[in-house]
Curated annotation (Swiss-Prot):
Keywords: Ribonucleoprotein, Ribosomal protein. Belongs to the universal ribosomal protein uS9 family. It comes from Bordetella pertussis (strain Tohama I / ATCC BAA-589 / NCTC 13251). The gene is rpsI. GO terms for molecular function: RNA binding; structural constituent of ribosome. This is Small ribosomal subunit protein uS9. The keyword Hydrolase does not apply. One of its GO terms (biological process) is translation. The keyword Transferase does not apply. GO terms for cellular component: cytosolic small ribosomal subunit. InterPro entries: Ribosomal_Su5_D2-typ_SF, Ribosomal_uS9, Ribosomal_uS9_bac/plastid, Ribosomal_uS9_CS, Ribsml_uS5_D2-typ_fold_subgr.
Amino acid sequence: MIGNWNYGTGRRKTSVARVFIKKGSGKIVVNGKPVDEFFARETGRMIVHQPLELTGHLESFDIKVNVHGGGETGQAGAVRHGITRALIDYDAALKPALSQAGFVTRDAREVERKKVGFRKARRRKQFSKR
């Protein structure tokens, strides 16, 4: 499968996406389903299409994605990051535009750990004065 495909790995929170692109008609398949079916919300589809719209390749590539882990938004972000890396693998001249838009940088925000003696990461137990 790797023959004439360009590859990119994308990550966001706990989601990991493996993205393969090749010249084609613009079909995007995520985990064996069309992108419209996999991402039910419009925001998820919009996030996935951003790097393609920016570079003007919305209907130039067939894209196969395998994504796992995390939730819907994290997976959409991981797919966007993977598509960006695959586009750079295809044509390095696209990197400045994608970098300017902030798609190349991996979003490093992760869930903060729960601390001992707290209810959540920062939420303390209720204080009773008396």
